[in-house]
Structure formats: structure tokens, C-alpha cells
Amino acid sequence: MQRKVFIKYLFNIINSFNISVDDFFKKTKDREIVEARHIFYWLCYNDGKLKISVIVRMMKDYGYNIGHSSVIYGINTIDETEDNYQLTIKESLCLV
């Protein structure tokens, strides 16, 4: 079940941002990809109810080694935005 949630949000994000799976899991500081990952972490955690440790493990399964603190930072980055931005994210991904 957790993997299904992870995959669902992964494909929603890469399709919305028009990036490849390889780019999503590539170590880069490209603003668009970093923002996509932050939104992905936020969705998995808040909407998908995945634990941070599960997100970290599944990211690692795809070859992207990330620490708990980086996932928490990404989640907090989106949490600190205005509520209408969060709603816009969900609407644009057809999750509302």
C-alpha cells in the first residue's frame, strides 16, 4: 500500500513538472526539481500519510540517498507557504 501511494504521487509530480524519473532522482540543486521533490515529500507525508522513514527508504530504493532532516525541511518548506498555495498544488494534481 505504501509503495502504491509513493508511486502515485511520484508520477503525478513528474507529469505536472514535466521532468523525467531520472531527473527527479538525480542529485541536483536545479530549482524546479528541488521544488518538485519538496512538494512530493509534503504530499506523501500529509496527504498519503507516509512516515518520513518510509519516504527516506523508498527514495533510497530509487537510488536517491536523502536524510530525514532533508525530507523534514522539504515538508516544512511547503507547510510554511500560504494555504491557498497548498490547495493549488492539490488542485493542479487533481487530488482535491
Segments the model singles out, each with a brief description of its role:
Residues 1-11:
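General nucleic-acid-binding
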Residues 7, 38-39, 69-72:
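Non-catalytic, well-ordered alpha-helical scaffold segments
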Residues 11-37, 66:
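Short, Lys/Arg-enriched anionic-surface-contact patches
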Residues 14-15, 45, 56, 60:
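Residue-level preference for well-ordered alpha-helical positions
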Residues 33-50:
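Short, amphipathic alpha-helical "recognition" segments used to contact nucleic acids or chromatin
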Residues 45, 75-82:
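DNA major-groove recognition helix of helix-turn-helix
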Residues 51-53, 57-74:
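Short, basic interhelical loop/turn and adjoining N-cap
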Residues 82-96:
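Short Lys/Arg-enriched helix C-cap and helix-to-coil transition segments
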